[in-house]
C-alpha cells in the first residue's frame, strides 16, 4: 500500500504517524511518503505559540470538541514523560479576560482548575471586568514538528520537498491513498470556497519574567484581534492580529505597532522586553474542519483521498483527535479493499 501525505505541518505529520502506528503491523508493505514545499521551520505550525485552547463558542460540529478533548488527554498523558522537553510540551496557567461576563466554555472541565477570577485578580487588569483562570498545556510547534519528523524517519517514512500541482499528478505516480493536509493552500489542489486565510502576525520577545498566558477577548473586534501574551520555553509570543482573506506574508509595521502597544498596555513590564523576531502566518479558516474521504477518478481507476484541513487557529489544539479520525478513515479503505484485518482498537 502506497500512501502519500501532502503537507508537513502538525496535521500532516501527526496523521502520517497515526496511520503508520496503527497499520504497519497488519499491512505490509506500508509505504508512506510526505510531500511538502515547506518543512519546519517554515510552516504555519512553526508560527503558532502552541497554547491548547479551542474557540470559546461551541463548534457547529460537536465532533470537533471531541477531537480537541482527545488531543488534550493525549498531551496530558505525555506531559511528565521523559520526551516532554523534546516535544516542547509543558503545563502553563493563565488568564482569559473579558469586558463583561460570558458563559463558561464547553471545555472548562477539560482543562485543569478552571475558575472565575476574583475581584483582586481583576484589579491587575483595569481594562477588563471579568475573566477565568485555569491550567492548560503548551505544545511548541517547532519542537513538536522535529520530534514527529524523527519518529516518522525511524519508521521508514520518506520526506520529499516538492510542490504538488494536483492529486492526479500523485495518483499517476502510483499512490493508492492520498492524505490531503495542505492547510490554507488546499484550495490550490481542489477548489474550496469555504476556505480562507486568516492572516496573523506575532512577535517573539525575551521576557523570562512572564510565567502566565494572558488572552483578551473583544466581541467587537472578533477572535484573535485583541492582545494576547503566551510564554514559551525560550521566548514569549505577543499577538493580536487576525485578517480574513489577507494573503500578505510581509510583516506589517501597523500590525507591529498594534501588537506592541496592546500587549504593553496589558502587561506594562513588556516595555523592557527585547524583541527577538517577528513572523507572519496564515490560519486555514473554514466554518468546519474538512475531514472526510473522497474517491477521485484518475485514469482507469479511482484514487482514495482523505482530506484533513481547515483547522483555523487551533491546529495544535485539535491535531491528535483529527489524526486518529483520519487513521480510522484509512482503516475503512483497507476494509473495503480487503487488504487487512482491522487491528484491535487502541487509539
UniProtKB/Swiss-Prot annotation:
Catalyzes the oxidative deamination of D-amino acids with broad substrate specificity. Required to catabolize D-amino acids synthesized endogenously, of gastrointestinal bacterial origin or obtained from the diet, and to use these as nutrients. Regulates the level of D-amino acid neurotransmitters in the brain, such as D-serine, a co-agonist of N-methyl D-aspartate (NMDA) receptors, and may modulate synaptic transmission. Catalyzes the first step of the racemization of D-DOPA to L-DOPA, for possible use in an alternative dopamine biosynthesis pathway. It comes from Homo sapiens (Human). Homodimer. Interacts with DAOA; the interaction is direct, can occur in the presence or absence of FAD or substrate bound to DAO, and results in a complex containing two DAO homodimers and 2 DAOA monomers. Interacts with BSN (via coiled region); the interaction is direct and inhibits DAO enzyme activity. FAD binds at residues 8-11, 37-38, 43-45, 49-51, 163-164, 182, 283, 312-313, 315-317. GO terms for molecular function: D-amino-acid dehydrogenase activity; D-amino-acid oxidase activity; FAD binding; glycine oxidase activity; identical protein binding. D-proline binds at residues 228, 283, 313. D-serine binds at residues 224, 228, 283, 313. Induction: Induced in cells following exposure to etoposide. This is D-amino-acid oxidase. Changing residue 120 to E/L: Increases activity and FAD-binding. Decreases protein localization to peroxisomes with protein mislocalized to the nucleus and cytosol. Residues 216-228 are annotated as: Active site lid that may open upon substrate/product migration in and out of the active site and close to increase the hydrophobicity of the active site, to make the hydride transfer reaction more efficient. It is an enzyme of class 1 (oxidoreductase). Optimum pH is 9.5-10. InterPro entries: D-amino_acid_oxidase_CS, DAO, FAD-dep_OxRdtase. Expressed in the cerebellum, in astrocytes of the cortex, in motor neurons and fibers of the lumbar spinal cord (at protein level). Expressed in goblet cells of the small intestine (at protein level). Increased in the cerebellum of schizophrenic patients (at protein level). Decreased in motor neurons of the spinal cord of patients with amyotrophic lateral sclerosis (at protein level). Expressed in the cerebellum, spinal cord, kidney, and thalamus. Abundant in glia of the cerebellum and predominantly neuronal in the dorsolateral prefrontal cortex, hippocampus and substantia nigra.
